């Protein structure tokens, strides 16, 4: 994947403003609320019976932070995303059996969360760079499935 200097700047510039805990929790909660079938991967998280329960669930919050922290590794390693996510791809494929389509869904949700939090900074060019990034990350995570 080739990243232009502008794309790298748009991605890293916005990432520097992201509160990983808050945006991660919001992104994972939105995924579970908007796509309720994804809850089956989080059965150990306790009460996911309503949007209020999901948003208030400390395990959702903690895992959302973990997911977005991991996503930060992609931002730090834009030129080596495939290798950065090799172990996570293996884990999600072999042990967790997560449908790789869910990576794309979470990427789309992350775009919505970023746009909501950073509306002034989230220009069409910024969105294009982030769409490319979430596609590349989703592809890297789905790699072990092929």
From Swiss-Prot:
The keyword Flavoprotein does not apply. One of its GO terms (molecular function) is oxygen binding. Keywords: Heme, Iron, Metal-binding, Oxygen transport, Transport. CDD domains: Hb-beta-like. It comes from the Eukaryota. One of its GO terms (biological process) is hydrogen peroxide catabolic process. Heterotetramer of two alpha chains and two beta chains. Belongs to the globin family. This is Hemoglobin subunit beta.
